[in-house]
A protein has these predicted regions:
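C-terminal catalytic "cap/lid" subdomain
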Residues: 1-267
Length: 267
């Protein structure tokens, strides 16, 4: 089984990815798709007069501050547009895809971070009324039931809190939790670069292989959102996933290329 995380950044080619998913499922491979929505949510927030606010933690990780209005915008982008049209693309290719968010059937459950600590202008401060969290439980039985019936789950990066609130979660880390819960052999994280770069944005500085014992040290090379991807890779490996690959989502046959070792392979 392979879990695929499609990044939400500009440049990723969904047609190439969906064509590859269709080809692989026809060969009998079990695939679960998790997708992001960052760029689409940013654009929608700008149109609605509520632009996204990205914040940085004291540890250097960037995330979206999600008040209730931002959560509503994110749901519109992630579930209303990206998830629906990803499923549409796959259905046109003969894949019986089914769209879900982590809220559906309590697929992804986690603790809501009502307040978050950020660094702003060199000083730490607390932001409250935040609707973000971290996935702690996966309804693996639901995903297995769908896979056994021939569906390809396409999951939007939302979860439900223990109190029943919808929460925005990091898609890379959520994909890692899904991969671990289902005993997936591979987690492929598709981005708008060839993989982890030693000197971003120089694409010729691609790091082709990282030993899984040294993956945490590779966060030093990660810039921006790539830091969360490295964290997700670390968590997936700790949960027993055999291999994590950061691969280029802009090219044709991105999944096959990743499976052939193109990108950054961590094992």
């Amino acid at each position: 089984m392979t879990v695929i995380k499609i990044g939400g950044s500009v440049g990723i080619n969904l047609d190439f990815i969906c064509a590859d998913v269709a080809a692989l499922t026809k060969e009998g491979k079990q695939i679960i798709v998790m997708h992001g929505a960052g760029n689409e949510a940013n654009a929608l927030g700008d149109k609605l007069g509520h632009p996204a606010k990205h914040v940085t933690s004291p540890q250097g990780y960037t995330s979206r501050y999600t008040d209730r209005a931002t959560l509503e915008i994110f749901v519109m982008a992630a579930c209303g547009k990206i998830n629906t049209f990803l499923v549409e693309r796959l259905q046109k290719l003969g894949v019986n895809a089914i769209g879900l968010s982590g809220v559906d059937g309590r697929l992804l459950v986690g603790a809501r971070k009502d307040a978050i600590r950020i660094v702003e202008n060199g000083k730490q401060r607390i932001l409250r009324d935040d609707y973000t969290g971290r996935v702690e439980k996966v309804n693996a039985d639901l995903l297995r039931a769908l896979l056994e019936r021939g569906y390809v789950p396409v999951v939007a990066p939302l979860a439900i809190s223990y109190q029943g609130d919808a929460i925005n979660v990091d898609g890379d880390r959520a994909a890692a939790m899904i991969a671990g819960a289902l005993g997936a052999e591979q987690l492929i994280i598709l981005t708008n670069v060839p993989g982890l770069l030693r000197a971003f944005p120089d694409e010729s500085s691609l790091i082709a292989h990282i030993d899984k014992q040294r993956v945490e040290a590779s966060v030093d090379f990660a810039e921006g959102r790539m830091k969360k991807k490295v964290l997700g890779a670390t968590e997936a490996l700790a949960l027993g996933v055999r291999q994590v690959i950061f691969a280029d989502g802009r090219v044709e046959q991105p999944l096959r290329r990743a499976m052939e070792g193109k990108g950054t392979v961590i094992d």
